[in-house]
């Protein structure tokens, strides 16, 4: 009985550690995107999303393609 409880607790700890890693990485990526700007000729979103660096504007080239251009 003790072995089953120990195995259950270890499994729960491993599962929680595996589940926590992608969430932390996702938060880190979104913070980096919000803080930075996009350089010339990078994909952007005119309505939301990362902003282009100063002097550049997000221009819609087609329905599926918007880029930071001067």
UniProtKB/Swiss-Prot annotation:
Disulfide bonds: 37-53, 44-58, 52-68
Keyword Transcription listed: no
Secretion signal, residue range per the UniProt entry: 1-20
Residues with the Leucine amide modification: 69
Main location: secreted
Residue ranges annotated as propeptide in the record: 21-34
Further information: The primary structure of the mature peptide is identical to that of U2-agatoxin-Aop1a (Agelenin) from Allagelena opulenta (AC P31328).
Protein name: U2-agatoxin-Ao1a
Lineage of source species: Eukaryota, Metazoa, Ecdysozoa, Arthropoda, Chelicerata
């Amino acid at each position: 009985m003790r072995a089953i409880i120990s195995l259950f607790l270890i499994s729960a700890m491993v599962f929680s550690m595996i589940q926590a890693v992608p969430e932390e990485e996702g938060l880190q990526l979104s913070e980096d995107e919000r803080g930075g700007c996009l350089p010339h000729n990078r994909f952007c979103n005119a309505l939301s999303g990362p902003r282009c660096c100063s002097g550049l504007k997000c221009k819609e080239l087609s329905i599926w393609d918007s880029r930071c251009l001067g």
